[in-house]
Amino acid sequence: MAVSSSSDVIVLSVGIILAALYLFREQIFSAAKPKTVQVPSSKAAAGGNGNPRDFIAKMKEGKKRIVIFYGSQTGTAEEYAIRLAKEAKSKFGLASLVCDPEEYDFENLDQVPEDCCVFFVMATYGEGEPTDNAVQLCQNLSDESFEFSNGEHKLPGLKYVIFGLGNKTYEHYNLISRNVDRDLQKMGAIRIGERGEGDDDKSMEEDYLEWKDGMWEAFAKAMNVEEGQGGDSPDFVVTEVFDHPEEKVYLGELSARALTRTKGIHDAKNPYPAPIIAAKELFAPGSDRNCVHIELSTESSGITYQHGDHVGVWPSNADKEVDRLLYALGLHEKKDTVINIESLDPALAKVPFPVPTTYATVLRHYIDISALAGRQILGVLAKFAPNPEAEAVLKDLNSNKEHYQNIVANGCMKLGEVLQYAAGNDLHADPTASNTTAWKIPFDIIVSSIPRLQPRYYSISSSPKLYPNAIHATVVVLKYKSEKAPRVEERWIYGVGSNFLLNLKYASHHDKAATLVSDDSPSEPSIVSHYPTYSIEGPRGAYKQGDVVKVPIHVRRSTFRLPTNPKSPVIMIGPGTGVAPFRGFVQERVAMARRTIEKHGPEGLADWGPIRLYYGCRRSDQDFLYKDEWPEYAKELHGKFIMRCAFSREPPYKPDGSKIYVQDLIWEDAEQIADAILNGKGYVYICGDAKSMSKSVEETLCRILGEAKGGSAEVEGAAELKLLKERNRLLLDVWS
């Protein structure tokens, strides 16, 4: 209906204004009122109901003499923090507050009582960086302008203990724990014992065990406490349940959302069962290794990714290892019994997985029974041995480091295998009730002693620009030989995640494990081989529905990214499966090139910087990954993509007969690389093995840059490399 007169317009306008004033009266008029802020009383602030970020108040309220802060990216540092808390309780009867530093403020760190101690368990992440949850803590300690409650940047007399977690294959080994230690001492804090440093490249566990005994001795003196004041008390109580609704029992689901299949985001607590679109073997027939290319559908999942991100795959433990431990614990007949688990001290030990669940589910899906059996746990389990002989074996392996190394570590023995070994059982036979001695180990000890089964991360080898509804991964299947030990034959050891994926690949092709690459060859007839199989159906058949096989995944974000400007030169070094993210990088550029050519023709790429890929493998006819794809990408990029390959087991070789690797090709192209980096402001990416390849490549880059600057690799070259890292123009995605 049309408005017929100006008076009608005025009346209508006034009506609208009045209605708006009424509807939004609180927002409009409350702005004029002064806001009142409730300030908690000092008594409330000091208690648990006060500031939740006040760790001092929580220590006092809980009568804790120890506070333990952990900087953890993958959960390992947190596990060691909890172990230290448990040992403080069992040795000295001292209660600890285990804290994620991200959840607390540190202005009152100077208020820690004199009879208390602060522990720091700090992992070094990436290129000498603090873990995400420890960034603020490290900044507060290092920033001299940061003031504690005393108005100064000082911590006089603060007692502390520090243990660092790192990997010697990385340049900045344990840098964060060293920096924290340095900063604390500069502020007048007093370290108890030596600074501990664990090396994940060798044995974090052994480094921890060697450090902790001397630390606890120094701790007892500094804190004026005596060992023996604690006691062995369980962390959990396990109860068998017989009347719980079946649909509410966790059978491998990681969260309530996953159990109820509630719609929501998919993350580490709620992985997405991604259907396998395609899966194929990348190595040539006759190879002694497997490499799986797998394509996973993310359509309608809400999952997004970028080139350079990682896909987290949630594996299960192999069937044989689950059965082995069920028999060794005397639980095989009760494997499907529903159990509930409660923590006796939630502040110290949280139940690490959802409950109620079953014995078999815990061993298959929730804890890492496939890991190397730790020396410390063997001492704990000795008293539950079925006979004196088995007890003596475990005590010896626990106390004798050399025996443990020769038998358990060199033999790559899992906990179930060690229990069989100690009891005199045959490790190589399929476990049964008749050939596996049952131990009377309380299940709560298994839960508290074995860490969670973690996802395995793989570089995504596709670009969302070409594959918006699919994630590709390139996974070499881990298989290596153990060393022969007394009563333990040399045998094949299989990686959990990659062999899980290999099983899924064959299931998606309706093949059996018998079609896998042969484990034995005429030259190695004595190696014991039992290729692992997995229950791939998943909880309640969620991962296999008819002919569709699914993989539980989530995406982990990365900063491993191409420069946004295609004019910047790019240098990528990725031998073996290190080439995986670079396939995604090249696809990203191909997608951009297609759009550019569509608008401006091929000349639109004229000012693009070159994309150089240095790739290496054994043989061009055996393990050259995506061999047929690279020439197609090169065509689409009209000369901007250059690929050089080093084949270590076929000619040409060096003049002295030695093998050619990617770093040799980089040195051959020294002039072009120096020009791309120094004049073209190019970006360098390295992906692959951190032990030797990454170090050798960085050393070669130092030589190239040092010579280009008219100096040496050690001075000018190292300075340029450092500058590249600081400016995020040298990025690494490496593993040991």
Swiss-Prot record:
Residues 25-736 are cytoplasmic. Residues 269-546 form the FAD-binding FR-type domain. FMN binds at residues 72-77, 123-126, 165-174, 200. Residues 1 are lumenal. NADP(+) binds at R289, T577, S648, R649, K659, I660, Y661, V662, Q663. Belongs to the NADPH--cytochrome P450 reductase family. This is NADPH--cytochrome P450 reductase.
